[in-house]
Amino acid sequence: MNSRQIAVNPMRLKRTRYRYETSGQWYKGSLHLHTVSSDGHLTLDELIQKYSEEKFDFISVTDHWCLPKLNGNRRGWPLLVLNGVELDGYDHLGSYYHVLAVGASLKPPLFNGNFLKTLRTAYSQGAILIWAHPYWTGNSLQEGIRHKFHGLEIYNHSSQCENGSGYALFHWDGMLNHNPDFLGFATDDSHFIPEQPYWKGGWIMVNAADCTQQEILENIRRGNFYSTQGPEFKTIEFGENSVSVETSAVTYVRLIGPRRTGRWVHALGRHPNFQAEFDLSRDWPYARLEIEDA
């Protein structure tokens, strides 16, 4: 697939609650990364250096069953590092999952391999639970509905490069029909091992007043971010029954509703500041925006 896409988190329509408030600044972040503490090949400091050189403002290191050691180094780092961990295991019905817990404050004694117990503890402590690469893992929609995930990876760059299983838009639309507040994330899942050198392929842009742990996590929880492989939203604004956007140079802007509903604009000429406006249907339980630049 040659095009690069981005997806904006859904706007719940029947209750007239629009998700976005974009008066702050946009901050670039990557939420699924691994170091030598699990199955990655870079140290935490090396990983931070890589992502800071690419103008990332924050990252979440999500090693398998291992919280990053952030002791006292935060002030000297060129970007914000959020606590995170990747959990994996089987649930009570025998289904297998990978789940990111971003903003986790779990203590090491809880990492005893009990997947469901640790997942519930992370949820109770306020971690953002992200259903990781469901297509790659082979999860069904019903397996996602079964647990209290806050969102899922709609794009995982490592899975896409490895065997073409990185996209999970079918899972996302199914989850949105079940829960219109369900969030969509684009991630790298970077390891920096010779057979998996992939990175810089998927990230999120969070709109926040400042790049602090509290501000970033709060706005991720609210869904005040978009996921991207490159194209940019500059503004997202709402009228009484409409949404208008300004974007980077794109070829398509789409408003996507449930099942086969939706609207689109073909952006001929690829203006560097393209603008589009859509009427919103009150009959839709949710709508999401998508732009494409090639």
Protein language model annotation of sequence segments:
Residues 1-26, 179, 190-294:
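C-terminal functional module detector
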Residues 6-132, 136-148, 153-174, 178, ...:
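A metal-dependent hydrolase metal-coordination microenvironment
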